[in-house]
Amino acid sequence: MDAAIRGNDVIFVLKTIGVPSACRQNEDPRFVEAFKCDELKRYIDNNPECTLFESLRDEEAYSIVRIFMDVDLDACLDEIDYLTAIQDFIIEVSNCVARFAFTECGAIHENVIKSMRSNFSLTKSTNRDKTSFHIIFLDTYTTMDTLIAMKRTLLELSRSSENPLTRSIDTAVYRRKTTLRVVGTRKNPNCDTIHVMQPPHDNIEDYLFTYVDMNNNSYYFSLQRRLEDLVPDKLWEPGFISFEDAIKRVSKIFINSIINFNDLDENNFTTVPLVIDYVTPCALCKKRSHKHPHQLSLENGAIRIYKTGNPHSCKVKIVPLDGNKLFNIAQRILDTNSVLLTERGDYIVWINNSWKFNSEEPLITKLILSIRHQLPKEYSSELLCPRKRKTVEANIRDMLVDSVETDTYPDKLPFKNGVLDLVDGMFYSGDDAKKYTCTVSTGFKFDDTKFVEDSPEMEELMNIINDIQPLTDENKKNRELYEKTLSSCLCGATKGCLTFFFGETATGKSTTKRLLKSAIGDLFVETGQTILTDVLDKGPNPFIANMHLKRSVFCSELPDFACSGSKKIRSDNIKKLTEPCVIGRPCFSNKINNRNHATIIIDTNYKPVFDRIDNALMRRIAVVRFRTHFSQPSGREAAENNDAYDKVKLLDEGLDGKIQNNRYRFAFLYLLVKWYKKYHVPIMKLYPTPEEIPDFAFYLKIGTLLVSSSVKHIPLMTDLSKKGYILYDNVVTLPLTTFQQKISKYFNSRLFGHDIESFINRHKKFANVSDEYLQYIFIEDISSP
């Protein structure tokens, strides 16, 4: 290596984002400046609000840089998770870079790993809502061309890794005229978050990727040769389209005429520079003209148009030839719309009459094999080679750019072999079902021969349901809510309230749960009490993450709230669980947004207790009571004398086994669809029943007793003053002691003392140190003469 490029201590910086190219090239002092390292440090200290972005001054003349990475994770990892993730991150990226350097640059694999792992600096962002840092490998040098060539390799690593830091590598920084924010400076004047240094590195030069100081511990590698410099032994293959047609395609791309067009032939078109008559700007990049000519190369059965000199100063254009069979195979498979990219970055594949995720098994490869016989004969033979299948799969992934919205059909129930329309009862299969893009399903096949009303299973099931929730006048409202709640589990839309299944032990709650799980399969998930009692935030929460797109979530066995130490149900959680999007991510994942389609059912033997009660909470709670007890013969007499039960039935010991064997799967599914049509067509409706919650009694009643005072009540002050009201700051108010006397007429202080005190503390105001009042008026005081 030339000694002239073994050192660089002049740092070129941009003073803002988006500096015009002309100002950058002319080094306009308003926009750019060059510093020595000590000068740069002083400038930052003297201008703490400055915005500086490090960049190469002239990439064509000098492009030696340190290997660097920008990581930006939209979540805050705790210290233990961060330390584990950063260790794995260093190992993963060093292995990846070493493999690339060995393959493309002829570097020594072990030397690259040693230089990267032994010396690097790490910044830390002051933004506490995310994990963001720059990492500079201080003794590992390369060229900007090499980093740009490495971009795709790092992108594949970030997509395949399970490490959240590796998945958050910003590969967009590997480009021409790239910039990296200088440590200690802001992104823009209004942003007060910065990247700070971390020990043991406290010199600013340790955080600059363009600073070069090679020593005995340094290691340098670069690309051995450019791909466009490689000329194949045999240029034009028999399977290609004619050379004349191919070169006409090239001519149409340029728009401007190619002066030496007639000089090109099959043997020299890769070596003869194209002489363009720039009557209009370049059709590829819109620049007025180019100093260096364009040239053609032949790679992977396609003509590649690139510019000599700096090839990145103009766009590279690929002209596919019909002879590129693997590219055409990928295009043909994409044209069938059998592979799609979801909003969350997952690939889904239409195979065996249903949409499936590509994450757990190589479904794209299976799709390629299954579609092989539908392709022309000259294509199908290519797919017998595993290496070529991998190439086709890579082409498909690269060609999929636009994501699609999925699971937007709330009235469709997906199965392994098709989709059931809940409104008209039609079952769609094959291509008819393909248009309903759903990424989750029941996980079993629909069988229309079992999906009938008249069957022995249906007769048995109706007896079970009628035992659990009797069809009596006293239980009519409860039975209706039971049917509404269970049938809403078929609907793929956000539900407005949560339902508590409340009753003593052995009253049919768990039997209902098992029947529902059997009927909707993988669309059902059972979770713990933590979704109700723990704070819901951006941190790892597999319970919430597992709710994504599920249609029924069953939360079983709430604690006895009378026990000391038991957590109350968080009112905020109830509100969040009725929103379309619930925040919570799986461990080591950036996917924090979960679409909430679930009917959330809480199975409890104990009266629910909430940390805070308000109108918003009461609008979101429904209660189904279970009062039929299923007893063994030995306990029947005691159960019949228990006031908690309306009826006592003998326990069927074999029922659980029948449910687990899915005996009632399609019978119950038929019943759910029937109830769905009865209650939820055309609009899905679930109504709360706050009157069923004892803790809500005070708040429901007090809303009928009080109104907030306002200016319209001032004319009534003559009569109101006789009833204890006073006028304070032009507002009718009620002294605290008077309020307590009046409220005691409606509520027993022994039963509702805590609720009354809580209401007063929330709404009372102070006239002075000793006088307290409330800005409320009793309705009877303004309605009575």
Curated annotation (Swiss-Prot):
Keyword DNA-binding among UniProt keywords: no
Key word Membrane present: no
Places the protein is found: Host cytoplasm
Signal peptide: none
InterPro entries listed in its UniProt record: DNA_primase/NTPase_C (IPR004968), Helicase_SF3_DNA-vir (IPR014015), P-loop_NTPase (IPR027417), Phage/plasmid_primase_P4_C (IPR014818), Viral_Helicase-Primase_Cplx (IPR051620)
Gene3D superfamilies reported for this sequence: P-loop containing nucleotide triphosphate hydrolases
Protein's UniProt name: Uncoating factor OPG117
Origin species: Vaccinia virus (strain Copenhagen) (VACV)
